[in-house]
UniProtKB/Swiss-Prot annotation:
The lineage of its organism: Archaea, Thermoproteota, Thermoprotei, Sulfolobales, Sulfolobaceae. This is Chorismate synthase. Belongs to the chorismate synthase family. NCBIfam families: aroC, PRK05382.1. FMN binds at residues 126-128, 286, 301-305, 328. Pfam families: Chorismate_synt. Reduced FMN (FMNH(2)). It comes from Sulfurisphaera tokodaii (strain DSM 16993 / JCM 10545 / NBRC 100140 / 7).
Amino acid sequence: MPGNSFGELFRITTFGESHGPMVGVVIDGVPAGLPIKKEDIEFELSFRRPGRQFVTGRREKDEPEIVSGVYNGRTTGAPITILVKNTDVISSLYEEIHYKPRPGHADLPYIMKYGFENWDYRGGGRASARETVGRVAASAIAKKLLMLTDTWIAGHLKSLGYVELNEPVTFEEVLCSKYSPVRASKKWLEKKYEELVKQATVEGDSWGGIAEIIVRNPPIGLGEPVFDKLKADLAKALLSIPAVMGFEYGLGFNAAKMKGSEANDEIVKKGDKYRWKFNNSGGILGGLSTGEDILVRCAFKPTSSIRKPQKTIDLRTGEETTISVIGRHDPAVAIRGVSVAEAMVSLVIVDHAMRAGYIPTVRISDDQIKIIEERWNKYISLCKPTQVSQ
């Protein structure tokens, strides 16, 4: 089963299954000298962690264990391996789906490709979103490296079901949405999202949503024409996330409804710099970053595992039957999906920053360490749960 690695210079390989002993990631290409603590990784994982209100009831501690590539609190330049144990597994809840593939899931395609006898049906196996733990763990290191360029990345849930945010939002509000149980950047929006999630839970159903990720202060010129354009790599990164159905940046699909005179980014002079007046392009033109904030969105479909009865096939008889999925599932996978989308954007940006020479590939100097630590501590402490806007 190839296809488990992502990135060029900053390269990750994830491993593990939903109900296996552990999941994890190997990170290649991290320069030596970067200060890394277990707490740095735990901070990012905490916003993806299950077992909280409005998400799956599976209670995983998600405590990372760094087993290689770090010595005396600093990276050595060798591959970094991070393990996260699966501690709250109830495989008996999945016995029915062994013979009844779930609608909307990868069950049947996996069976057809790899064979029924080779398919790990427990919790979705390798196709489970549990795999994304490794991506989020790696993003802590990516985000810390990006402190060198003072590049910050944050995401929020722009829409859930039919409720959508259609008013301006600041980067600080987006950053503080980490502490919202439904990743809302406004208090009024949080209440509406919570009502929808409660409704879906009662009905045994689910909702989809749209995650929006902002890259603040990205370096200019990230991206490599022609097939490694920044937008292309961002699209691949986000579309690789389980349940993601679509990707757009800047104006996105709305640009198709506009005239060129409306959609074009006018170039203006601000001080001694050339800037774009509206940033309609979402910080990317010609596949290269412009220096404006990068704005991307990805659409998550509703969680496929629902209690409502649906048609499927009983593989023992070959006949149609029904299935009601019993287990611990997110009523809206987009809520925790924001953290994963944020992580994937971080991995793309740090990889291209290294390729463009903005971040060293061999060793971090002592002066650079001071800059990284100062900015990272600011990132950790900047927002508090009470700062989610009204």
